[in-house]
Amino acid sequence: MATRIASFIGISTVASLALANGINVPDTISRDVIILGAGSSGTYAAIRLKDEGKTVAVVERNDYLGGHGETYYTEDNTPLNFGVEGFFNTSVTRNYLERLQVPYGRRNPAPAHEDYVNLNTGQRTEYPPGQLQDREAFAKWVDAISQFGFLDDGVYRITEPVPEDLIIPFADFVKKYHLEDAVYALFSHTSGDVLEMITLYVIQYIGIPHAAALNEGYVRPIEGIAALYKSAGKELGSDVLLKTTPESVQRSKDGVEVTVRSADGTKTLLKGKQLLVTIPPLLENLHGFPLSDQESRIFSKWQYHQYWAALVNDTGLPDDVNIVNVDTERLYGVPEEPFIWRLDNHWAPGYHNIKLVGGSDFGEDEAKAYMYEKLDLLHEEGTYSTHKPEIVKFASHTPVTMFVSAEEIRGGFYRQLYELQGLNSTFWTGATWASDYSTLLWGYTDEVLDQMASS
């Protein structure tokens, strides 16, 4: 009771006492919804909420919106996307782009032929013998996973009891459903050691909607992925607090208070009726959150991979070549972590995207050293005249493939995860809660916004 009584002391009295003692009183902003994170999900939610007449405050640690959706512009203003390179061509995507008046078109990769190289030896090889190309492989795969229709929208809406085939290692699923000749094509759309992954997570990388999108083609903003987020930034204006991080979060059924600190040290108190968290719910990301026992227990279970997206210039690689990694010593040609997945040619001469994947200890320094090592190896073997490149951008997409054990899934982990929605005026969305593809994340975010509206 004493705490509740104290909370009603006049604000002016508290401010006067604070000023008299040299304490800075943070400015206060009141909004309907406070959003943590302005990546793909957070930005989409902010625009949708504003369209519904809600007021928002969006807290973002970076100096830009869009998270992994970054674009580098060359001197002649050619947009080079790295990380997110396109969106599924669905009504959700088209409506969003048109809402923000962002011109878009079909995503076409830069013209190039693919060279298959074993990056453990630095030597050229071939597409893994006996492995199907994408279209044929996906047809077999879709037939095998069509039994899990509850995953078709990318959300972890898993039936209980959990089907055992969903939580066996992918290598076992492959043998059971005679998919041995489809593995390499499927690997190229996942992130991690695919043979050891639980089948559920492979489906969340390349499931029914993903295969359909690959067949139908992607779309992308003509002026680069960043154009979408620049337009959203103009719409949101001062409702976005860039280069700002939450310091403390207080939540109850009556509303939320979030104290944030900007890059210059200024503190601001954000008061809202609801909180929408779009950042990955790892315990290390939730400092300042007094989590419930249920939240702490669930969020402590996560494991994940590290994923780095490098945009490099002047590698010595030809401009008309994509390098695809094939490990000729491993089953189905699938590399083991850490590995470079691909080196892709770009739309401007000299530029390539490099995608690197590793375990939880594959940090930025390790990833850069690994990249240099493999480029050196290509030179030493005489495969290409490669040399140390200029790193234009080196972006972290960590954590990627956030996962839990088969035992946790069998025990109802995802049901318990979704039961957190709405507790203490707090809602959650983002890549942990649905397949990590923007179009699917936007679809799930729409569901969450409906829950918020009805709570």
Swiss-Prot record:
Positions of disulphide bridges: none
Keyword presence, Kinase: no
Gene3D superfamilies xrefs: 1.10.405.20, 3.30.70.1990, FAD/NAD(P)-binding domain
Superkingdom of the organism of origin: Eukaryota
Gene Ontology MF, one: beta-cyclopiazonate dehydrogenase activity
Enzyme class name: oxidoreductase
UniProt keywords, alphabetically: FAD, Flavoprotein, Oxidoreductase, Signal, Virulence
Function: Beta-cyclopiazonate dehydrogenase involved in the synthesis of the fungal neurotoxin alpha-cyclopiazonic acid (CPA). CpaO carries out the dehydrogenation of beta-CPA to yield an unstable enimine product, which is captured by intramolecular cyclization to create the pentacyclic fused scaffold of alpha-cyclopiazonate.
Protein name, per record: Beta-cyclopiazonate dehydrogenase
Organism from which the protein derives: Aspergillus flavus (strain ATCC 200026 / FGSC A1120 / IAM 13836 / NRRL 3357 / JCM 12722 / SRRC 167)
Gene assigned in the entry: cpaO
